[in-house]
Structures are given as structure tokens and as C-alpha cells.
């Protein structure tokens, strides 16, 4: 799937649901309490982060989209902390404050990046559902997507009023469901249960085929536009009417904490759809975003630059013609898997059998082969007027089609030295009958511990000779 970064700055989203404050106490523990067999934590640092629906809104704002939030809090210090954090992040938050009940707070005691204890301060809210619906309806004209972030804490009392109000305005409704009754989300454009939540409703799924069949039945029963089941290390499965199931593998490199991963999924989906992305592409972006956020500790948001890097890395993992930034990310990924990077360069104006043999030999020097290609202006400077015969785009396209070549990148200078300083290959390869020290860029590569190898040329294979022969016949 080809992914690209949406214009999130043109993506207003309204989030309605259960807001809460995630509070963290970080400290050191080196002894057991004499009062009970529990560790003693000496608190050194504390921090507050928006949680629940507030984290969804925070994630949307972090991507550069406009986030509006409607929720319910107490009238207390925790609500003030939540409001201040959201305001600083650019979230337009509208809270229904209740005097008689506290803001929901999840306190986590941490030591050495490990969670030792969680303490919940909460009571189910007795929400003024009618007033909340009025607030939501007054904001729908300003947004392109409505998100229902339901944690079952009482902020959402009448889901159907909100869903129907949005549908009447042709605004997609995304719901992150909770509980044992998904009928309350009837008519939603998309719901995003995790596998456990999904199986609570439909029963255990023995395999993907059963998951798909039960998911399609649920969609029909509840008049859902689509269903996205998040499946942890097994990725995500998107179901749509009349379309084959789309299974996306998990993209996490390392998993430190899954807290808030569901919030990240629905927030990225909402922002991408509001920015005009088609649903499969939005799901692909959400899958990448989830892979990033589980690598962070605690409730966290991802930024637009982080997602952009992930998109570029995803495209860079494919073989073919890449820009420099994509190439560097692809190299980073390859090295993370212990792969040896080989680099060679040239004009490759008219690709011939000698080139093919040489590139196959170059590829055999390592695991990944990068081919640097002189752009048109540098070929003209090196080869003279009338060259290149083929434009740089055509030359790179032909090279990218060879099985021996992983990545192709162009450079504007006459030599690849500047490119070598950025790419830093493990092996620099050149074809010819000269010594290693005569290879352009050899000193750069050897300075950081890389290798330089010279391969023999295939006899009777010369682009210049081929060009001259064509001209004589013409």
C-alpha cells in the first residue's frame, strides 16, 4: 500500500467522550518496606498527561490537525491540570464540570520504567446528556469527523443522538467501543474494537476466516460502514461492505507500553479521514502510528514528524527509486537487521550486458545494493554534448527493475563523494583495472572503517562504444 502524509492542517476533528488524567509518579526503589512485603518508592518526579478521550484529542493536535474536545470533569485540581495541558497542546476543550464528582485520575507509580502500582480515582459520571448533545451539535458544523471515545465512564449516555446528528450532516462517525452492547454504536461509520472487545461480542474466533465472517455479520446487524479490529502483535483487520478484508501486519519495532495505543489508532484514523484520505490509507497510517506509540512509555502522543518518518521508512523499505531522505531511513532499517550495505555509482546511460553482470557482482559483496546515478547535467559535463541519451528518470527506472539492485538514488555532483558521506556504505564497489586508492570516495569510506573493492569489467562492453556504433549506423 502506497502511503503519503496527509494535509493534517486542513483536518478539523471533534472528539466526545470520557476524559481522564493520567498521573505518573517516577522514583527509585532499593528496599522493601518493613511494614509489608512491598517496595518503597522514593518519588523523584511526577507528571500529568491527558488520558482517555483527552489523549485522543491530544494525538490529533500533535499531528497538526485541529482538535475539538467535549467531555465531563469534576471541578478540581485534576480538571485544571487537564485543561492546562490540553490548552498548551492546542486542543479546544469544552468541559462539562460537575461539582459533586471528581475528575477521573489514573495514578501510576513507576520505577526504572516499570509500573509498580496503579491507583484509580473515579466514579461513573451522572452526565447532563441533553446539554452535552447541544454542545456537540453546535460544533459539528466546524468539523469533518466525529470521534466517540467511549471508556464506559458515563460521559456518553445517548450515543444514537450524536451519531444521527453527525449522519444528518454527512459527517463520518468513528467510535472506539466499550462494553458488551455494541448496538449503541448502530449506524457509526467505523468502530475500532480490539480483539478482546470484538470477541466479547461475537464469540471466540478460531482463525482469520471466522473473524472476517463474524465481523461482516456484525457490520450488517448494526448498519456499520466499516469495522477495524486491532489485534496487537497480529496487526489490524479492516472489513468493508463488498470489499475483501484488509489485513495489515503490526509495525512495532519494540513494545514498551501499550497504554493508549487504541487512542492513537482512532486519532490517526480520524485526522487522516478529515484530511481527505481514503479509509485503507488512513488505516495504514494508523497502523504505523500504533507501531510508534507502543515504543514509548506511558500514555503518549506521536507527532507529525514521527509519523512522516515512519511513512518514509515504510516506502523506503520497498525496492526502487528513492529520495535521499527515504534512502537514509531504508539504510537505517537494513542495518538494524544486520544487513551489509554496498554502494556503486555511474552514469548508466545505455544499460547493457556488462552493466548487468557488474551489478550482480556488486550485489554479491553484501546484502543490499545502492546504485548512485549521475543526473543529466553532470553526465553532460562528464561525457560531453549529446549525452545523456536517456534522462535520469529513465535510467533510474531501468536500474530499479534489475533483481540485483535494491535502491537507486541520483546525485547532482560530478562525483558521489557528498552522497557517500551521507550514505556511509559498508562496501564501496567500482569496476575497472585501477587500484583501490584511485577509486573516487575511497578515502571517505575507509576513514570510517568501510571497505573499497574493485571489480573487473566485462570485456567488449562500453556505453560510449555502443553510442558511437548507433551514431555510425544512423
From Swiss-Prot:
Active site (catalytic residues): 263
SUPFAM superfamilies: Nucleotidylyl transferase, Ribokinase-like
Name of the protein in its database record: Bifunctional protein HldE
GO annotation terms (biological process): ADP-L-glycero-beta-D-manno-heptose biosynthetic process; lipopolysaccharide core region biosynthetic process
Oligomer status and interactors: Homodimer.
Keywords: ATP-binding, Carbohydrate metabolism, Kinase, Lipopolysaccharide biosynthesis, Multifunctional enzyme, Nucleotide-binding, Nucleotidyltransferase, Transferase
Pfam families: CTP_transf_like, PfkB
Binding positions (ATP): 194-197
Region (Ribokinase): 1-318
Documented EC number(s): 2.7.1.167, 2.7.7.70
Chain's gene name: hldE
Amino acid at each position: 500500500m502506497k502511503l503519503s502524509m496527509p494535509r493534517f492542517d486542513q483536518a478539523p476533528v471533534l472528539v466526545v467522550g470520557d476524559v481522564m488524567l493520567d498521573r505518573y509518579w517516577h522514583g527509585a526503589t532499593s528496599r522493601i518496606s518493613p511494614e509489608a512485603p512491598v517496595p518503597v518508592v522514593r518519588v523523584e518526579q511526577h507528571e500529568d498527561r491527558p488520558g482517555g478521550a483527552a489523549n485522543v484529542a491530544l494525538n490529533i493536535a500533535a499531528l497538526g490537525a485541529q482538535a475539538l474536545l467535549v467531555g465531563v470533569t469534576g471541578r478540581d485540581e485534576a480538571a485544571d491540570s487537564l485543561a492546562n495541558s490540553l490548552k498548551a497542546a492546542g486542543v479546544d476543550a469544552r468541559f462539562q464540570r460537575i461539582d459533586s464528582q471528581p475528575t477521573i485520575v489514573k495514578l501510576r507509580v513507576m520505577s526504572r520504567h516499570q509500573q509498580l502500582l496503579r491507583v484509580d480515582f473515579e466514579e461513573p459520571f451522572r452526565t447532563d446528556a441533553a446539554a452535552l448533545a447541544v454542545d456537540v451539535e453546535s460544533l459539528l458544523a466546524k468539523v469533518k469527523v466525529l470521534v466517540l471515545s467511549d471508556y464506559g465512564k458515563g460521559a456518553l449516555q445517548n450515543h444514537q443522538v450524536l451519531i444521527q446528528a453527525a449522519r444528518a450532516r454527512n459527517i463520518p462517525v468513528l467510535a472506539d467501543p466499550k462494553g458488551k452492547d455494541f448496538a449503541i454504536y448502530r449506524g457509526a461509520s467505523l468502530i475500532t474494537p480490539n480483539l478482546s472487545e470484538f470477541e466479547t461480542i461475537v464469540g471466540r474466533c478460531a482463525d482469520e476466516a471466522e473473524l472476517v465472517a463474524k465481523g461482516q455479520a456484525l457490520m450488517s446487524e448494526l448498519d456499520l460502514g466499516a469495522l477495524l479490529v486491532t489485534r496487537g502483535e497480529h496487526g489490524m483487520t479492516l472489513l468493508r461492505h463488498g470489499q475483501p478484508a484488509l489485513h495489515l501486519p503490526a509495525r512495532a519495532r519494540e513494545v514498551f507500553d501499550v497504554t493508549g495505543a487504541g487512542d492513537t489508532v482512532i486519532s490517526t484514523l480520524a485526522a487522516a479521514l478529515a484530511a481527505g484520505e481514503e479509509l485503507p490509507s488512513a488505516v495504514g497510517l494508523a497502523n504505523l502510528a500504533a507501531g510508534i506509540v507502543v515504543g514509548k512509555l506511558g500514555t503518549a502522543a506521536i507527532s507529525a514528524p514521527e509519523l512522516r518518518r515512519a511513512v518514509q521508512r515504510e516506502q523506503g523499505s520497498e525496492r526502487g527509486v528513492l529520495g535521499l531522505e527515504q534512502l537514509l531511513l531504508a539504510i537505517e532499517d537494513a542495518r538494524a537487521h544486520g544487513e551489509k550495505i554496498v554502494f556503486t555509482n555511474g552514469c548508466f546511460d545505455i544499460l547493457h550486458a556488462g552493466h548487468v553482470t557488474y551489478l550482480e557482482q556488486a550485489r554479491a559483496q553484501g546484502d543490499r545494493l545502492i546504485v548512485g546515478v549521475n543526473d543529466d547535467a553532470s553526465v553532460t559535463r562528464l561525457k560531453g554534448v549529446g549525452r545523456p541519451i536517456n534522462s535520469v528518470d529513465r535510467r533510474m527506472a531501468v536500474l530499479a527493475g534489475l533483481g540485483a539492485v535494491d535502491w537507486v538514488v541520483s546525485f547532482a555532483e560530478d562525483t558521489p563523494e557528498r552522497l557517500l558521506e551521507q550514505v556511509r556504505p559498508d562496501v564501496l564497489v567500482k569496476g575497472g583495472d585501477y587500484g583501490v586508492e584511485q577509486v573516487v570516495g575511497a578515502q571517505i569510506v575507509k576513514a570510517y572503517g568501510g571497505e573499497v573493492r574493485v571489480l573487473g569489467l566485462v570485456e567488449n562492453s562500453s556505453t560510449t562504444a555502443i553510442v558511437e556504433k548507433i551514431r555510425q549506423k544512423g
